[in-house]
Design a protein with these regions (language model features):
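Catalytic core and acceptor-binding pocket of nucleotide-sugar-dependent glycosyltransferases
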Residues: 155-187
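Residues that flank catalytic or metal-binding motifs in active/ligand-binding sites
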Residues: 87, 110, 146-149, 183
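A structural signal for well-ordered alpha-helical segments within the folded catalytic domains
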Residues: 5-8, 85-89, 181-186
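Short beta-strand-to-loop element that shapes/binds the nucleotide-sugar donor at the catalytic cleft/hinge
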Residues: 126-155
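GT-A fold catalytic core of metal-dependent nucleotide-sugar glycosyltransferases
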Residues: 83-137
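Short acidic-hydrophobic catalytic motif
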Residues: 76
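N-terminal anchoring/stem segment of glycosyltransferases
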Residues: 1-73, 82, 97-103, 155
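Short catalytic/ligand-binding loop motif for oxyanion handling, primarily in non-cytosolic enzymes
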Residues: 5-6, 34-37, 116-119, 124-125, ...
Length: 187
C-alpha cells in the first residue's frame, strides 16, 4: 500500500522541514483502527480517520462495485471511484469544518507521497498561494486533467469554495458516474 511506503516519509519530512508555528497539518488516515500509534507527533499535526466520515462510508457501501474492475477486463484506475473518493471526502470534511469557522485562509491538499526537501515557512507558501487567486495546482500539458497531488483552495474566494461543494456533491449524489472517468482529478 502506498501509504505505508510514502506516508511515513512525508510525515517525517514535514516534522523536520516545516516551520511548526506557520502551519497546521490535518492527516487523514485509513485503516488505522482509530489509532495513530507510531506516527510522527508534532503540535501542528492532527490525525483524523477517514472511517469517521459517514458520507464516505455510505459512498463506498453504495458503490463498492465501482472499483476499476469490470469482469475479466484489466484493472482501470480511471474507473475506480472507490479509490479516489478518499481524497474528495478528506478535503471536503476539512473544508466544511473551516467553512463553519468562517476561515478565509488557504486549504492545501498534499498527497502522501509529497516529500519536503528543504525548510518550508509561511513566506515560502505565500509565493505560490497568491491572495488574488482562487485555486493553485500543478497543471499538465499532455493530459486533460491536473495533477492533484498538490492543490490549494483560497477559502476567501467564492469559486474555490464552490468547487469543493460541487466536488463533494458529485460523490454524495453519485453524479461522478456520469463522467467518462471517475478520478478526483478528472471530475
Amino acid at each position: 500500500q502506498h501509504e505505508e511506503v510514502y506516508g511515513l516519509k512525508m510525515l517525517d519530512s514535514v516534522v523536520k522541514k516545516w516551520k511548526p508555528t506557520d502551519f497546521k497539518l490535518h492527516v487523514y488516515l485509513e485503516g488505522y483502527d482509530g489509532k495513530s500509534d507510531g506516527l510522527p507527533e508534532a503540535d501542528f499535526i492532527e490525525y483524523r480517520h477517514l472511517e469517521n466520515i459517514q458520507a464516505r462510508t455510505d459512498f463506498i457501501t453504495r458503490n463498492s462495485d465501482k472499483n476499476g474492475r469490470f469482469g475479466e477486463a484489466p484493472y482501470n484506475y480511471r474507473m475506480d471511484a472507490v479509490r479516489f473518493c478518499h481524497k474528495v471526502y478528506a478535503m471536503s470534511d476539512l473544508f466544511f469544518e473551516l467553512l463553519e469557522q468562517e476561515s478565509k485562509d488557504w486549504m492545501v491538499w498534499l498527497d502522501a507521497d509529497t516529500i519536503t526537501k528543504k525548510m518550508f515557512k509561511a513566506e515560502d507558501a505565500a509565493k505560490i498561494l497568491i491572495p488574488e487567486v482562487d485555486i493553485v495546482h500543478l497543471g499538465r500539458i499532455d493530459i486533460d486533467y491536473s495533477e492533484t497531488g498538490f492543490i490549494g483552495f483560497n477559502l476567501g474566494m467564492h469559486n474555490a469554495c464552490s468547487l469543493l461543494v460541487d466536488l463533494r456533491g458529485a460523490y454524495d449524489t453519485d453524479e461522478v458516474f456520469a463522467y467518462r472517468e471517475w478520478t478526483d482529478a478528472f471530475v
